[in-house]
């Protein structure tokens, strides 16, 4: 959902629009759309409070439109069901977030679209393709204000839409749709997703506690699987360089916020799903190899490194995985990328760029310098409005990362002389 109001979140009671697909955690998504239970040109009216969410399905009653919307997920596809309660005109209204290159085209029952995913800074962009089909023949398709309005027979109270997405091509999206959701059987799609989640969550058994306590536990476990996301498509993936690469038997994962996940989520997955965790670490290696600067990312998404928060914690994740026996990633190559990153990329919070005078000071003195009282910031790259230098947090986080790099190097047999600088920074 995208919400009305300044907060733009669940504190708002009105929904502005829905999205067919969300490429990144907490992002607004691509391919905005909404169902209309009346005049398709009137503003969309809906609230989200009458919703029911499970790992394998979601439904919500959009009271302003008198429409119940349900969705069941596949791996790279989904099945939507729209139940219109009011007689009269029914429509689905689609658009693309990117107003320059984006499009949604409907011919007969077939839907084809392109949108562009981008980050808040505008330096990360990736094409997203969608293919879909309706179970009901539209009575009309028209363009209105950059939107594609798809009308359906008034007597058709239920409309189903199956869709699939790809970062590679429209043809790849069509193949994923045919493979994952070949029909409009909602119970089958939701049931298949339920089996997958039941098997996944059932890997951990708990004893004792109340029903509420167990619900909290398994909900938390479910949420740890939100990231990272496997974006391998028929053995290929879109890399940080914008090119299509062969996965070579190691699935490619993106959408990680390592500042949030290095402490618990990654260590847990190294225990529960070691093969996947190794693939995730190898994905980080590939990202480091495929970006222009050769830097290890910290907040990787489909098209690059968001580079949010402070410090660089993939070293901690990789050390932990290695010590838990995860071996299916190129650890020595990972070390070289991490070492190169530490020596050439700045530690300034929320800034992806070369070393600044603050980094030079840190390497010489062992701590990140702060500002004197009432001193005005002058260093290029430091956010003067909100984030600032965060000198204490950066120094503490850098010490942890330096310790992890030194320990990781010793695990790999790296020459001790190369590790001395990290041992010194860790103290």
What label would you give each PLM region?
Residues 1-316, 320-396, 401-427:
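Accessory carbohydrate-recognition regions in carbohydrate-active enzymes
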